[in-house]
């Protein structure tokens, strides 16, 4: 079924006559030309799906929502960096993170009768992922570009590990709980580029570290180019805020 999450009534019609015990809601947008589209897709789409399942009295055992570590934004930015925890106050610094947070808040507002579990993966890599592929292309062309001079701690999770976490949540997740997902390691930007370099056979590489205003200029140009051409780009305002954030550590112990 190709569900239409933008139209609540049509969505209910599409779900009518079906019974689902388990739902994994991974549909969403990570890049949009217009800021409002993040909220139409990520927030409203989640709300429409949850409302439809409730209205149809779907006999759900688990509803797993794929959110993001980005809902927290730049918290715990003072060195030495410590792990972001579920007790921190979210301050998302991207439209994507804000839209995911609003979706989480809507699920929280429904109440205990809706058996939802929220997964918050950090940067996900794997087949068909584009942003990290661009980094690999840059290293392959012998350029390692980093922005900002202050230490940056970054974290990742492989897509297959996210899938495994989904199955664990479906089997054992506690309703109303939120879990961070990462591989448990912390990397510097240099560590990351070195990993890519080794995977590519150790090509020679020129390391360039630029001030953040250079990144601001690049992403500003990318944003305007996207608006003029109508083509979504990875070099946008959200990407600037993501790369400015220095601490991506997260507490995975509850998971």
Label each residue range with its predicted role.
Residues 5-44, 48, 69-74:
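NAD(P)H-binding glycine-rich loop region in Rossmannoid oxidoreductase-like domains
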Residues 48-95:
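Conserved Rossmann-fold NAD(P)-dependent oxidoreductase catalytic core, especially the SDR/UDP-sugar
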Residues 72, 117-134:
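Flexible, glycine-rich beta-alpha linker
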Residues 91-119:
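Active-site Tyr-X1-5-Lys
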Residues 102, 129-134, 148-170, 176-177:
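Substrate-positioning beta->alpha
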Residues 169-235, 252:
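Mid/C-terminal beta-alpha module of Rossmann-like enzyme folds, strongest
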């Amino acid at each position: 079924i190709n569900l239409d999450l933008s139209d609540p009534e049509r969505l209910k019609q599409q779900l009518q006559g079906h019974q689902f015990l388990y739902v994994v809601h991974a549909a969403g947008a990570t890049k949009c030309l217009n800021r409002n589209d993040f909220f139409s897709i990520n927030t409203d789409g989640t709300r429409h799906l949850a409302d439809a399942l409730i209205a149809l009295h779907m006999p759900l055992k688990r509803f797993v929502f794929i959110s993001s570590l980005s809902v927290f934004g730049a918290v715990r930015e003072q060195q030495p960096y410590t792990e972001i925890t579920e007790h921190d106050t979210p301050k998302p610094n991207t439209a994507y993170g804000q839209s995911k947070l609003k979706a989480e808040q809507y699920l929280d507002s429904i109440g205990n009768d809706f058996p939802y579990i929220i997964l918050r993966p950090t940067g996900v890599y794997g087949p068909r992922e584009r942003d990290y592929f661009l980094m690999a292309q840059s290293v392959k062309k012998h350029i390692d570009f980093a922005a900002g001079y202050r230490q940056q701690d970054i974290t990742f999770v492989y897509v297959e590990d996210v899938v495994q976490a989904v199955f664990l949540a479906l089997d054992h997740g506690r309703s109303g709980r939120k879990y961070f997902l990462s591989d448990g390691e912390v990397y510097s930007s240099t560590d990351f580029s070195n990993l890519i370099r080794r995977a590519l056979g150790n090509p020679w590489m020129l390391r360039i570290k630029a001030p953040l205003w250079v990144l601001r200029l690049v992403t500003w140009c990318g944003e305007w180019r996207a608006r003029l051409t109508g083509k979504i780009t990875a070099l946008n305002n959200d990407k600037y805020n993501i790369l400015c954030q220095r601490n991506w550590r997260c507490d995975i112990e509850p998971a």
